[in-house]
Amino acid sequence: MNTFQTLIYEKKDSIAYITLNRPKALNVYNIQMRDELYQVLGAVRDDPDVAVAILKGAGDKAFCAGADLTEFLTAPSPIIARQVRWERDVWGLFLSLPQPVIAALHGYVLGDGIEMALCCDIRIASSDAQFGAPEVGLGIIPAAGGTQTLPRMVGRSKALEMLLTGRRLNAQEAYKAGLVNRVVPREELLPTTEEIARKIASYSKMVVRITKQATIRGLDLTLNEGLELEKRLETLNQVQGF
């Protein structure tokens, strides 16, 4: 049952659906959405029945057009704002989820929207999607992980061009840059995303989780260290009988 104001959370079989639900405001990320996402992501993480999650935006115009700066820049004090952010580390929670997360991206994918998408494991874009990081032009830095996740996806030069100039990429440019996995017509966005989710959900949950863990953790290791990690995780998989 959905009891949130800025999100819709549903489970169908073993697939979790998280929908950013502020369509009149282009699904911009505000304080309430942060708190509700923190709660929902924790529920997904702790639910053994969830094999994969889909993240999408409500409405026709945007996945997420950024953050609501009127809220985040008017906190009672910078100290309180930082403390609350540390206590509700939504981005860290995204990155630590054991289940794969697939982002279905349409319309505006800007600011916190692109940073949220970059925390997902697979990104499917509709042909009308636009990607950008306008924060520098607003006098702030992309502090929701954009300076770290974007260059890891598209490389240093392309990331700096986007971050320092605010240049937007259309869907095909994003695909060529490696920012998204596929580009599909708008009407095929959710069906394509669900097809991928169902494929993943058809496999052993443990094997999927271990494969994700080995891949992501291995990126920060040397090749030899990564191979050792892979062996340890495969042994764990065999011991548990999967």
Task: Give the predicted meaning of each segment.
Residues M1-A16, D47-P48, D60, G166-Q172, ...:
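C-terminal alpha-helix plus adjacent terminal tail
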Residues M1-K56, G92:
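Conserved CoA-thioester-binding segment of acyl-CoA-metabolizing enzymes
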Residues I15-T19, I54-K56, P76, I102-A104, ...:
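Structural motif
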Residues I18, R22, L37, L55, ...:
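Terminal peptide-recognition signature
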Residues M33-E36, Q83-W86, M116, L189, ...:
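Hydrophobic alpha-helical membrane-association signature
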Residues R34, L69, E87, W91, ...:
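A general structural signal for well-ordered alpha-helical segments in protein cores
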Residues G57-L93, V109, G139, T222:
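Glycine- (often His-adjacent) and acidic-residue-rich active-site loop
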Residues G92-M206:
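Crotonase-fold acyl-CoA enzyme core
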